[in-house]
Amino acid sequence: MPRVKRGVTARARHKKVIAAAKGYRGRRGNVFRIAKQAVMRAGQYAYRDRRNKKRTFRALWITRINAAVREQGLSYSVFIAGLKKAAIELDRKVLADLAVRDKAGFAAIVQQAKAALAA
């Protein structure tokens, strides 16, 4: 059986890892062994943070809605309860966007929620 020479394959593998580590500081960007570890760790961080991003954005939306609703004289939890009673099915992303971009429209929604709470 002939000997398998892996020069081309190894070079390609190394180039792929070094390319993925482009921009890293020091030996993390140009020494294969260290770059490989850095790229693996970066992948773990990316995987974890793709999940955390959903939490972070939801928290941001809730904070924005809460701030806008308090200007109207309600708290966030009471406002959400009012939306449920009024059968308004807007998600937090849309509500936060309205609170930032369309204050009049958001105020109208808050009034509907208040009316549903009073009824």
Curated annotation (Swiss-Prot):
InterPro entries: Ribosomal_bL20, RIBOSOMAL_L20_CS, Ribosomal_protein_bL20_C. The keyword Zinc-finger does not apply. CDD domains: Ribosomal_L20. Keywords: Ribonucleoprotein, Ribosomal protein, RNA-binding, rRNA-binding. GO terms for molecular function: rRNA binding; structural constituent of ribosome. Gene3D superfamilies: 6.10.160.10, Ribosomal protein L20 (1.10.1900.20). Pfam families: Ribosomal_L20. One of its GO terms (cellular component) is ribosome. The keyword Flavoprotein does not apply. Transmembrane segments: none annotated. Disulfide bonds: none annotated. One of its GO terms (biological process) is translation. Binds directly to 23S ribosomal RNA and is necessary for the in vitro assembly process of the 50S ribosomal subunit. It is not involved in the protein synthesizing functions of that subunit. Belongs to the bacterial ribosomal protein bL20 family. This is Large ribosomal subunit protein bL20. It comes from Bordetella avium (strain 197N).
